[in-house]
């Protein structure tokens, strides 16, 4: 059997077959053929360049060639060492099978060196290239290139072996510029272009520059909307074959990449690589603008847009613009209502796979991300990152309009919407509008009465996972959030933040109607309903309406008689946990709320607020019937009953109401004590 020739490793396509391939598949074929030729040259099988290779290098269609044109001539001279002998893209299984099958037919033991050369390094023409590569390799890897009579190196660098290299995690090729390592030389070559900014491929539509033609092709598919690869399971289409492969694992549940540190498995190798940085703490991507570091390059790229404020991806439906194509794709689902990711545990559907992943943790209770400072654990790495800023005091996001600083960019975005008044999310049931889609989702549960989050301890259900988390602390007694000022502890971080404002006196939310200021935006929203008289929450049992859903929930317990909160000290039961908390202070004698004006102390903040009105003489609650004003809304409510009972107008005058000895009759006369 003679030595291997290019004909043995060439794959032919007819014109019809070639036209059936898409651009990505044609590029893949081109890369495979060029690699086969480079490998033959590398082995010292000196061939004149076949017309097929010339054609492929000029990016012409190979199917237009005749069969005899593909046959290589007898050996003439040895070609130079091809440094980038590995292709830039992964070879598809179909091409792998054909190529490796052809290698097997001839046998790699028959891949002979050119006569007169005992080793690959003997060839003078590519000795320099070989020596350059040899310096990059370990001693073991270097020996792989030295063979006596037959060349085994060809098989050593086959696709099968390259696949093994990926799974063993070996990364012999290191970038001298930043120290990053790669398992393939071609990956290192591509990576180097990032440093030299060799962005030769430019998008004519948006002006974006890329250092790979494949990256430009991928980019074009984003705005063209070209999606060739469709999932047979759910019908979803993708613009890359690799993305489809990764997507299929959602259905199969396959997770072939496992972390040796904690045992967690992943469906993608890249996700495993990123995950490993949680354990190592590595953050190789640094922002030149603000100095912030990132463990993932994609997160770093997204972060950069914060500084540029570039938003190239626009929604055709509503005109809203985004800085990520993925965010636009997710946003479109608001208009279509599509929720392709479904939880098998409870049937809940989501429009993002990442949201489904986060949701699943509710059922498992898994909290793999632990704070080294205080030991608190979280189910999301992003929440751990946010939590750490409590210890460091870092607040990198500042809104110049109000001067407020935030630990998260998302919180800054939310705050901006408060000032602009933007509310793009509309409830179809009642017409109410919201600033955030998540708030609309929660609001809808009022109409559907859906409560997917259930307490295993007492069976109580909630419409928010955060409410369930807070509720569980009633059973455990856990209060992880402590005030450094007075030592008071809270079950929720939001309660601690609200409490801190008591000490600082900060009240950023002001009512335009009466000028009253509040610590929380939610309190301002509730307060506004006093002026509008809006009471959207109605009791089906008795028809009574309320301006807060929480008050309706409390009211319903009057009908059911439910009192789930019991005092261990005296066995007294309450309908609300807040009432139990207030009651406990009777036993302890605790009165943490003190009046700065007169020094009087109270066991409830609401009572201190009411008391302060004695000093300020503030009476915000006014009777529309007779203009009488009150310090409390409850007093106004009681007063209104006088008008409803048909009492004459002068009964509103305190002088006509007299002392305590009489009672008011329906006619307005007072019964005198006998």
Swiss-Prot record:
<keyword id="KW-0804">Transcription</keyword>
<feature type="zinc finger region" description="C2H2-type 13">
    <location>
        <begin position="481"/>
        <end position="503"/>
    </location>
</feature>
<dbReference type="InterPro" id="IPR036236">
    <property type="entry name" value="Znf_C2H2_sf"/>
</dbReference>
<feature type="zinc finger region" description="C2H2-type 4">
    <location>
        <begin position="229"/>
        <end position="251"/>
    </location>
</feature>
<feature type="zinc finger region" description="C2H2-type 12">
    <location>
        <begin position="453"/>
        <end position="475"/>
    </location>
</feature>
<dbReference type="InterPro" id="IPR001909">
    <property type="entry name" value="KRAB"/>
</dbReference>
<protein>
    <recommendedName>
        <fullName>Zinc finger protein 429</fullName>
    </recommendedName>
</protein>
<dbReference type="Pfam" id="PF01352">
    <property type="entry name" value="KRAB"/>
</dbReference>
<feature type="zinc finger region" description="C2H2-type 17">
    <location>
        <begin position="593"/>
        <end position="615"/>
    </location>
</feature>
<feature type="zinc finger region" description="C2H2-type 6">
    <location>
        <begin position="285"/>
        <end position="307"/>
    </location>
</feature>
<feature type="zinc finger region" description="C2H2-type 5">
    <location>
        <begin position="257"/>
        <end position="279"/>
    </location>
</feature>
<dbReference type="InterPro" id="IPR050758">
    <property type="entry name" value="Znf_C2H2-type"/>
</dbReference>
<dbReference type="GO" id="GO:0000981">
    <property type="term" value="F:DNA-binding transcription factor activity, RNA polymerase II-specific"/>
</dbReference>
<dbReference type="GO" id="GO:0006357">
    <property type="term" value="P:regulation of transcription by RNA polymerase II"/>
</dbReference>
<feature type="zinc finger region" description="C2H2-type 1; degenerate">
    <location>
        <begin position="145"/>
        <end position="167"/>
    </location>
</feature>
<keyword id="KW-0862">Zinc</keyword>
<keyword id="KW-0597">Phosphoprotein</keyword>
<feature type="zinc finger region" description="C2H2-type 3; degenerate">
    <location>
        <begin position="201"/>
        <end position="223"/>
    </location>
</feature>
<keyword id="KW-0479">Metal-binding</keyword>
<keyword id="KW-0238">DNA-binding</keyword>
<keyword id="KW-0677">Repeat</keyword>
<dbReference type="InterPro" id="IPR036051">
    <property type="entry name" value="KRAB_dom_sf"/>
</dbReference>
<feature type="zinc finger region" description="C2H2-type 7">
    <location>
        <begin position="313"/>
        <end position="335"/>
    </location>
</feature>
<feature type="zinc finger region" description="C2H2-type 2">
    <location>
        <begin position="173"/>
        <end position="195"/>
    </location>
</feature>
<feature type="region of interest" description="Disordered">
    <location>
        <begin position="653"/>
        <end position="674"/>
    </location>
</feature>
<keyword id="KW-0863">Zinc-finger</keyword>
<feature type="domain" description="KRAB">
    <location>
        <begin position="4"/>
        <end position="75"/>
    </location>
</feature>
<feature type="zinc finger region" description="C2H2-type 16">
    <location>
        <begin position="565"/>
        <end position="587"/>
    </location>
</feature>
<feature type="zinc finger region" description="C2H2-type 8">
    <location>
        <begin position="341"/>
        <end position="363"/>
    </location>
</feature>
<dbReference type="GO" id="GO:0008270">
    <property type="term" value="F:zinc ion binding"/>
</dbReference>
<keyword id="KW-0539">Nucleus</keyword>
<feature type="zinc finger region" description="C2H2-type 11">
    <location>
        <begin position="425"/>
        <end position="447"/>
    </location>
</feature>
<dbReference type="Pfam" id="PF00096">
    <property type="entry name" value="zf-C2H2"/>
</dbReference>
<feature type="zinc finger region" description="C2H2-type 15">
    <location>
        <begin position="537"/>
        <end position="559"/>
    </location>
</feature>
<feature type="zinc finger region" description="C2H2-type 14">
    <location>
        <begin position="509"/>
        <end position="531"/>
    </location>
</feature>
<dbReference type="InterPro" id="IPR013087">
    <property type="entry name" value="Znf_C2H2_type"/>
</dbReference>
<comment type="function">
    <text>May be involved in transcriptional regulation.</text>
</comment>
<dbReference type="GO" id="GO:0005634">
    <property type="term" value="C:nucleus"/>
</dbReference>
<feature type="zinc finger region" description="C2H2-type 18">
    <location>
        <begin position="621"/>
        <end position="643"/>
    </location>
</feature>
<feature type="zinc finger region" description="C2H2-type 10; degenerate">
    <location>
        <begin position="397"/>
        <end position="419"/>
    </location>
</feature>
<feature type="zinc finger region" description="C2H2-type 9">
    <location>
        <begin position="369"/>
        <end position="391"/>
    </location>
</feature>
<feature type="modified residue" description="Phosphoserine">
    <location>
        <position position="605"/>
    </location>
</feature>
